[in-house]
Amino acid sequence: MPVSMAVCETANVVNAALRESLGGNSSAGSSTDQAKSGEDTNGSLQNHIVANAKRILMAKIEYEEVPNYHESVLENLKSKYIVIKPGNPGAINGFSGKNNTGKLVGANGHDNNGARKQAEHPNNQSHHINHHNHQHPTSNPNELPKPKRVLYPRENIRIGWKQSERKWQVGTGMINVGNTCYLNSTLQALLHIPALANWLVSEQAHLADCNVAEPGSGCIICAMTKTLLATQSNQSAVRPFLIYSKLKQICKHMVVGRQEDAHEFLRFLVEAMERAYLMRFRNYKELDQLVKETTPLGQIFGGYLRSEVRCLSCNHVSITFQHFQDLLLDIRKADSLEDAFEGHFSRERLEDMGYKCEGCKKKVSATKQFSLERAPITLCIQLKRFSMIGNKLTKQISFKSRIDLSKYAARSQAAQAQPLTYRLVSMVTHLGASQHCGHYTAIGSTDTGSFYNFDDSYVRPIAMHSVCNTNAYIMFFELDLSQAASPAANRPNGVRLTNGHSTTPVPAATVSSPSPTRFIGPQLPAGGANGYTNGNAQKTAIQFKQQNQQSPQNGLQLGTGKFQDTAKPPLVGAHAKGEATSAPTANGNKSSSPSSNSSSNHKSINQQQYLPISSDDEDIEDEMKPRPTTAQLPSMPNMTENHTEPKAKSPVKIQVKTPVKTPLKSLVPYESASEEEEAPLPNPRKRPSGEDSSESDQESGQTNGHSKTNGSHTNGSASSSVHVNNSKQKTDAIDEIFKSLKKSADSDEDDDEEEPSIQLTNGWHPQKQSQSQSKAPPSPKTPPSPAVIKSKTGIWKVTRNDEVDAIEDDVDVVVVEGSPVKIPTPNKNHRNPFSSSKPSTDSPATPGAKRQKLLNGSALKSHQQPRVGNGYQSNATSNGSTINELLKQSYRGYGSPVLSWNGKPAELEKELLVDAREQRQRDIDDDEENEMDRGRQRKVKSGSAKGNNASNSTPGYNPFQEYEGQKRWNKNGGGGGFPRFYNQNYRQNFQQRNKFKFNRFGGPGSAKFQQQRALQRHLSAGGGFSRRQPSAQQQQQT
């Protein structure tokens, strides 16, 4: 029977015995009888009590189990007593109020006598936990112990900005009140963590009736909540005085106005918030550590590491659990965040014979490895950038906006059930060389997914790639619930997203082409042998949209016998839907039949972002001129002279110089219209888009003004057919060339000693034709054309005979006369590599040869030394309009400005312009410095080349200034051996006056040395000599 019934029956027996004894005493009459009867009564009472007690003790007591103590005993007692405190604190959160001995246990693990509960230690086998209304006699020491009380359930944490009903703003900046950048950046990083911000907003009810106050200050949680609401509501920067004023409360050793470490402040701030939350409970000091770790801050930032120490002698494994709120990663041997995680969670060997094994009972060698037993909701990572002596490790650590820590989780079913995918929400960065100096900034995310940089009171948006390239110090990652709900599947190789955002995997080979047939291997693009396509196919970019145009390019370009990869190998090429029906060419590519409108509908996506890259060998076949007609498919180049059939209007004959070397067969014998067909040409001297295709730079031996020779003959092989277009644009361009040639001829009538400069329209050095070849009859079908025409049959020269010279006013063309056929090898100039400084004395000067001038920036041939300033060779007396026009063009000898594929100036041209601008500025600065150092000077007339003293004149020599200087140095008398002012030694020393003030050399060696120095300075300043200067220098040296 129950214990209560046994106790009640014993009480009834005792009461009956007392009544019986009292009733017997009242019936006695005399005193003696009363005394005797009293003794007997006492004895009988004792006998009755002893007999009943013995019977009760000998009786069998049966116990029955009741479902709840409240329902059986306490509920019956409530009817007799007034309940002051409802419920039992020991039974909150489903925990039983009994321990294994049957005693009532309080909420903090103590029994009623104040004795500590024996089952508190996690390794104690008698640990009792009752979550499901039944007893667990033992707990597994290899599992994480569960707290007896949960202060704040983990399920109440709201992860992500979308979980809150509040509309979150970007947030304002914080004013730096004096070396508080560490405080501002830490607060900004914390307030941009969604889980923490959602919890602080939920604390507004506590904010209304907060009675928690530490000595000397208020609640730090309320201060954080007010600061968060201030940054969300204000439009200007706020002053975090609520946190700044509690700096001593947060950490006692932090001093106001002194620079502090942001991570140290973060740790003290979180601990102060935890302490403020625990102060809401009266017996918070009696709570054990497991219960204290269930605060909201512990649930947000807290996690548990599983430490496994394995003995190398007996393989005994000791498992312990460690609570953490941030991970400190060593980056000395890591280049990325993944490498740092690998090093942190890898197995490491402990000190030899430094671990005492529980199985061996002795010190042995062991290994230790960490793993994640319970991952936190918000993962805080601190990179160890500072050493104990204050030095900073400033190496760049790369990281991604999303990280996966599933492989570092403990090998338990509970840990592996949930994927550990985190996304970056905020970070703290440090700028500076050490921890004692520098500046802290913060980066935070918003509900829209964008990131902002918080630099004290300044707030500005920042791109994602800039965030990942930031030199981070503290990073906050929050658990990604979207990835946890739908785990990311492993994508196979060769599969990528269609537009970079969709999660549907699409094979890369079928993104932009529905055609099932596809050639695998190296392929050549249509339109050029070096990899430049003329359609809308891309060279380096991935094309995501399907297009109707086709191109057989697949990403590998072949140019002049070698593979070329300009940027990255393209993943996909552009193929047309009708590719299967098109005829394949010799190299395995599909030819393009409807390519006439291939460049008029679409442009390549990334073609305006990449500049074409080619080597010197590939410059021979670099570009393709646009053509308004459909593509042609010629076969091998036809080496015949009569290939064009234009109309003739002038007695100009065209001579063909056939190359000696046999041209190679074109690897791509087809061509299409270029995408530059619609691009405007800014240079008026550049041929328009509808010009003759015989001037295609791809088929000629030059590109952008470069000349390429092989030995003594030009490799003029070509693979394009000659297509004649009699448009008005062509005639206008030719007329412009003839007008410029006529102006050049008029300006050079007085030039007697200049050798004929044989330079053609775009920087070529043509071959000299013989007199016999120049006497050939002119072709009656030849139209006016420029000085050179490049076609598949070679280089076409434009000459005229004496009869043409007689009718010069009617047709202005160039006369090229000279010795038998040969190609002069030009001398290279480092400033103008396309100019030739070798004097031509083979043939006499003729009026026609004198008028052969520069047309596109090439240099003139002359016997004189080239001018150093701009790389041109010209006569000092020549000031014609052609030279002025040339000076307005490109100054490096490239001819007309070379544009990129998108019609903009090339990067090389921009760099050259910048160099020229800087050189001019340096020259101006040097002139100003020389003018300032020179002081006041006497005026002097410049010496005439025909004067009597021309042979004795030195460039820049001023005898009057030398005389004044001589008087200045000899005003005190003395100077016994100084010669008179008109001695030549003064002229030799005048530019070295500041260096040799008191040393006037009189020997011939010193005079020669000083004269050479003066000549070098004169040339470097951009000066020149007259035509008879070499003879004058020779006389001076003698």
Swiss-Prot record:
Catalytic activity, reaction form: Thiol-dependent hydrolysis of ester, thioester, amide, peptide and isopeptide bonds formed by the C-terminal Gly of ubiquitin (a 76-residue protein attached to proteins as an intracellular targeting signal)
Coiled-coil region: none
Biased composition (Acidic residues): 747-756
Subcellular location: Nucleus, Nucleolus; Cytoplasm
The UniProt record lists the keyword Phosphoprotein: yes
Molecular-function annotations in GO: cysteine-type deubiquitinase activity; K63-linked deubiquitinase activity
Subunit relationships: Interacts with atms/PAF1, but not with CycT. Interacts (via C-terminus) with imd (via N-terminus).
Family per similarity comment: Belongs to the peptidase C19 family.
Protein name: Ubiquitin carboxyl-terminal hydrolase 36
Organism: Drosophila melanogaster
Gene name of this polypeptide: scny
